[in-house]
């Protein structure tokens, strides 16, 4: 479910040494399965462990996850990275905003999952997003752009060179992608 690197375990172990004996960590998701989902890590004293929690045992500590957060923390990773600027804890949870879908899920669900978990995080850097409106009977994914992508002069490149290539590579049953957006250039547009 969650991978906690050795560096992160060592970091947590140092922090836990200053806490009440038996205290571990809790990994959670606030608003799981929504665009506003946020992940967090907190101390988990022994009296805060619930019967429905999942305990994940690691070499240096245990991490507790509540049952509501668990499916959204699949493939999550916690790391402690050090570079020239200092050290920081990173928590990557690709499924926090949307549950991972299985390979035999309907095509629309699988495409939507890729858009939300892989494409939109890249577009978010420009204040943009894309949504799947439908998959046509002839195999085209109809998309709608929003935020900084609406009216952006680079949207055609993003659509054809980025999104379409990635989706066609992952879903050979698709014939292509089309943009439904009525682009209105404005201050919100990235380029």
Swiss-Prot record:
Keywords: 4Fe-4S, Iron, Iron-sulfur, Metal-binding. It comes from the Bacteria. Its cofactor is [4Fe-4S] cluster. One of its GO terms (molecular function) is iron ion binding. The keyword Iron-sulfur applies. Binds 1 [4Fe-4S] cluster per subunit. The cluster is presumably bound at the interface of two monomers. Pfam families: Fe-S_biosyn, NifU. The keyword Isomerase does not apply. GO terms for biological process: iron-sulfur cluster assembly; protein maturation. Coiled coil: none annotated. InterPro entries: Fe/S_biogenesis_protein_NfuA (IPR017726), FeS_biogenesis (IPR000361), FSCA_dom_sf (IPR034904), HesB-like_dom_sf (IPR035903), NIF_FeS_clus_asmbl_NifU_C (IPR001075). [4Fe-4S] cluster binds at residues 149, 152. HAMAP family: Fe_S_biogen_NfuA (MF_01637). Homodimer. Involved in iron-sulfur cluster biogenesis. Binds a 4Fe-4S cluster, can transfer this cluster to apoproteins, and thereby intervenes in the maturation of Fe/S proteins. Could also act as a scaffold/chaperone for damaged Fe/S proteins. Belongs to the NfuA family. NCBIfam families: PRK11190.1, YhgI_GntY. This is Fe/S biogenesis protein NfuA.
């Amino acid at each position: 479910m969650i991978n906690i690197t050795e560096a992160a375990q060592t970091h947590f172990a140092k922090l836990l040494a200053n806490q009440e004996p038996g205290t571990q960590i809790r990994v959670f998701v606030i608003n799981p399965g929504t665009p506003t989902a946020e992940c967090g890590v907190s101390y988990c004293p022994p009296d805060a462990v619930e019967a429905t929690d999942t305990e994940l045992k690691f070499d240096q500590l245990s991490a507790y996850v509540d049952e509501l957060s668990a499916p959204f923390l699949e493939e999550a990773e916690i790391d402690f990275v050090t570079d020239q600027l200092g050290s920081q804890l990173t928590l990557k949870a690709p499924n926090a905003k949307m549950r991972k879908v299985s390979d035999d899920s309907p095509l629309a669900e699988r495409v939507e999952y890729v858009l939300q978990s892989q494409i939109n995080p890249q577009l978010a850097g420009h204040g943009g997003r894309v949504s799947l409106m439908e998959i046509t009977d002839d195999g085209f994914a109809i998309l709608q752009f929003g935020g900084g992508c609406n009216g952006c002069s680079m949207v055609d490149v993003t659509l054809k060179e980025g999104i379409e290539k990635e989706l066609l590579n992952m879903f050979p049953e698709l014939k292509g992608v089309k943009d439904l957006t009525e682009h209105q250039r404005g201050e919100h547009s990235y380029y």
